[in-house]
């Protein structure tokens, strides 16, 4: 198998010269040297030599005039001599490994074997789980209000089986009605004989005519008029009292419901998968929480009580600020609200009943009672002027 490669490519205006060197492990000591011409296109293709089972080491070199451009690539092993021109093919006569065979070739085509194994295991688990669900296709969903239950409706429609789940009680099913409904419509109806009693932990089977069973009451009843019972998923089998009250009912599970259940379970499993990094973070968070909780538990009760007292004191020191109250402006000398108040007068006057009563009793003084000094002086001035 080839382990590494080293390519030296030289370009000039006239042509391209390349040096290819593969340096794998040596499988044998015997080597065969073959001459190689400078023109590879006219001779045997290079792929022929590479695909030969005898080749384990290939050295190809062409020499030419070096010009301006040169590109050198190196791998695990770099050799100093670049002027070697022979084409050497070491071979081993005992072993002849085929390139393209074995596990490596298989993995190159189909991927890692571990991944394939994991995928196959997941597929097997899914198929196994689905087979378990398919086994339950013949099962049912049954409900009852008492001890008498509908245990089974045969898939082929041959019988319907009732069971008394009580361990110490006898149940009377005389004149009870066993019916089957599809979309709310009754398609078949069977009435039990009167005075039929089911013993504790016993079964009663109603057989269809196609079963060719024998009529052996009180455990086996043959319904000759009914060829087969209906066992489809859309059919509900009901056991009713003589007055029509349902006391037990039975519904089979369809394979489509089983498939839907499988899809739901697979989707739930995908959603519930937790990545390893997330689990690690969860575990770290849990560990840190446990450490903090332990440290808190180790603290003495006195510190906790002191902390509570200090916290209460801090709460007591805080005072709630009362927002300022804005009173409406009004004049203290009149009742007109549009007159602004005097700046040196308080906005709120104390209420005094005596003064309030005196103000109400007081009457306003008329203008006639007031002496008019200005008018008197004018009269005197007019009389003096007349005398003169």
UniProtKB/Swiss-Prot annotation:
Residue span of region Disordered: 349-388
One BP term from GO: cell population proliferation
Statement: the UniProt record of this protein carries the keyword Oxidoreductase? no
**Where does the record place the LTD domain?**
136-254
Give an example GO cellular component term for this record. nuclear envelope
What's one Pfam family the UniProt record gives for this protein? LTD
Q: Which UniProt keywords apply?
A: Intermediate filament
Highest rank taxon of the organism: Eukaryota
Family statement: Belongs to the intermediate filament family.
Q: Tell me what this protein is called.
A: Lamin tail domain-containing protein 1
Give the organism, scientific name: Homo sapiens (Human)
Q: What is the lineage of its organism?
A: Eukaryota, Metazoa, Chordata, Craniata, Vertebrata
Q: Which gene encodes it?
A: LMNTD1
């Amino acid at each position: 198998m080839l382990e590494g490669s080293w390519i030296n490519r030289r370009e000039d205006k006239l042509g391209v010269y390349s040096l290819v060197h593969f340096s794998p492990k040596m499988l044998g000591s015997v080597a065969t040297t073959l001459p190689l011409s400078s023109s590879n296109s006219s001779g045997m293709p290079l792929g022929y030599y590479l695909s030969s089972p005898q080749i384990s080491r290939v050295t190809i070199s062409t020499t030419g005039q070096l010009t301006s451009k040169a590109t050198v690539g190196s791998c695990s092993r770099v050799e100093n001599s670049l002027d070697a021109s022979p084409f050497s093919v070491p071979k081993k006569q005992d072993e002849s490994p085929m390139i393209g065979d074995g596990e490596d070739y298989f993995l190159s085509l189909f991927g890692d074997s571990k991944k394939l194994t994991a995928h196959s295991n997941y597929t097997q688990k899914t198929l196994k789980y689905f087979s378990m669900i398919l086994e339950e296709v013949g099962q049912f969903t049954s409900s009852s209000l008492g001890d008498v239950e509908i245990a089974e409706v045969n898939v082929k429609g041959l019988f319907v089986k009732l069971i008394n789940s009580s361990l110490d009680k006898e149940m009377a099913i005389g004149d009870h009605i066993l019916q089957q409904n599809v979309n709310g419509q009754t398609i078949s109806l069977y009435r039990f004989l009167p005075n039929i009693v089911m013993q504790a932990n016993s079964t009663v089977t109603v057989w269809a005519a196609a079963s060719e069973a024998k009529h052996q009451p009180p455990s086996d009843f043959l319904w000759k008029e009914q060829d087969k019972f209906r066992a489809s998923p859309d059919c509900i089998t009901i056991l009713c009292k003589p007055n029509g009250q349902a006391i037990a009912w039975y519904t089979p599970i369809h394979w489509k419901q089983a498939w839907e259940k499988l899809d739901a379970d697979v989707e739930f499993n995908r959603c519930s998968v937790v990545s390893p990094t997330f689990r690690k973070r969860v575990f770290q968070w849990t560990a840190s929480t446990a450490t903090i909780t332990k440290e808190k538990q180790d603290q003495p009760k006195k510190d906790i009580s002191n902390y509570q007292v200090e916290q209460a004191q801090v709460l007591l020191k805080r005072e709630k600020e009362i927002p300022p109250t804005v009173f409406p402006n009004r004049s203290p000398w009149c009742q007109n609200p549009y007159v602004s108040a005097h700046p040196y007068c308080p906005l709120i006057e104390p209420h005094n009943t005596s003064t309030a009563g005196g103000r109400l009793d007081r009457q306003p003084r008329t203008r006639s009672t007031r002496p008019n000094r200005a008018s008197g002086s004018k009269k005197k001035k007019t009389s003096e002027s007349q005398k003169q």
